[in-house]
Amino acid sequence: MRGNQLSYEDPFASAPVDTAPAEEAQQQTPTESPWDPPAQQTQTVEVRPAPADALSITFKGDGSYSAPWLVPKYASVTEALVDLGVDPDEVAKLGQGQKWFALMDRVTKMADHFANLGGGSKPNSGGGGSGGGGQQHQSRAPQQAQEAPGGEERFCKHGKMEFKSGVSKAGNTYALFSCTAPRNEQCPAQYPSKKNG
């Protein structure tokens, strides 16, 4: 084909134009395919989206990225308290400020309970110290990469820090001690001593 000149004769150029079947097809209503299963009656469940100004409560297993979260949403503090197990008669006696304090107390207790059920490690509530019973963290790194050279250990106000070493995405090696508290409460990282000897 060159330009708009065909190098061969168009076999459809002299075919008669039949518009009747096309118009007929347009008027027919589509039918169900014989291969489709018969339509079934389904029950509809009304799903009410929470209003934009809804109250949401987040229960986190711990501060790690892999821990599960539960995020129920409520229309009011009163609704949240009742749903979280507070007696409705007791809630009715509280002023708005008292309801908020009661909600914070209830959420804190439930979050601790969630962490104890295996939703993650229980968040450290401060106090520091290096006593036993600290958080257990699972790491995929080999044992040698989890221990600082020379057995060095570091501590912060949350207890014993975790040694981490490896190669960054940029290809740089790193070694540091990381706080084991939830992410928003973590102390700054500390770096191992550089002893050449």
Curated annotation (Swiss-Prot):
Compositionally biased spans, kind Gly residues: 117-135
The name this protein goes by in its record: Gene 49 protein
Region (Disordered): 1-49, 114-157
Species annotation: Mycobacterium phage D29
Positions with biased composition (Low complexity): 136-146
Classification lineage: Viruses, Duplodnaviria, Heunggongvirae, Uroviricota, Caudoviricetes
